[in-house]
Amino acid sequence: VVEQNENIVRNRKMLNQTSREMWEASSKAFARLDNKVPYIISTGNHEYGYKRSENGMTHFPEYFPFERNTAWRDLCVSAIPNRNGVASLENAAFEFNEPTWGKILIITSEFAPRDEVLDWAKKLVASETYKDSKVIFMTHGYLNPGTPPKGGTIRDKEKYALSPMNVGTQIWEKLLYPSSNIRLLICGHTGNGNSKYEDNVGYRIDNNTSGKPIHQMMFNVQF
């Protein structure tokens, strides 16, 4: 969990399977934040399919609908339907005005986002409304543990049947690199499970097409 003032950004898998019991437990855990904090969730591989992204089926919009948390009401500025054509916060954008940072746009995406998700995000950040905002993009799978040159590589494949999908290198090429105002990417997903901090976090910096640095950070709190 990353905490900035009164906003909480969460990027880790909520479940380790998609059973009703898991969804109920996750929903109950977040309930203490409802109507108080505008938490933002990035869905992971275990939120889809029967256990691990065999398909795009998910209960996310059922348990986390927009009207669940009144703290989202004035902050959510855009969203598009999920893989099943259902209105959902899986792909959504939230705008904040911070005294120190100015205008911030946080975009969260489904696991292994489809082309239409990346196209939506790219057009949104380049729009007249948000072209001067500092943008944070969240997605579940993107970066491997470590830092360059030995680690911190951008993921170029995912071993899931989910389709269509874009992996880390494609997210970089299609969205991050050509966008001039995305300044930070946050992801989760990877880790070695050995309880060593350095093996369960990742970080790298690369410049976008405008020559501006994009900080890319992975952390996996389950390990």
Where are the predicted features?
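His/acidic metal-ligating clusters that form di-metal
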Residues: 32-35, 86-90, 95, 103-204
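Short, active-site-adjacent cap segments at secondary-structure transitions
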Residues: 2-4, 48-49, 144-145, 193
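Extended active-site neighborhood of metal-dependent phosphoesterases/phosphodiesterases
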Residues: 8-120, 129-130, 197-218
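Active-site beta-strand/loop signature of hydrolases that rely on acidic residues for catalysis
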Residues: 1-7, 13, 44, 134-140
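Active-site proximal loops enriched in glycine and acidic residues that flank catalytic Cys/His/Asp
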Residues: 140-141, 218-220
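Acidic/histidine-rich helix-loop elements
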Residues: 2-20, 66, 146-164
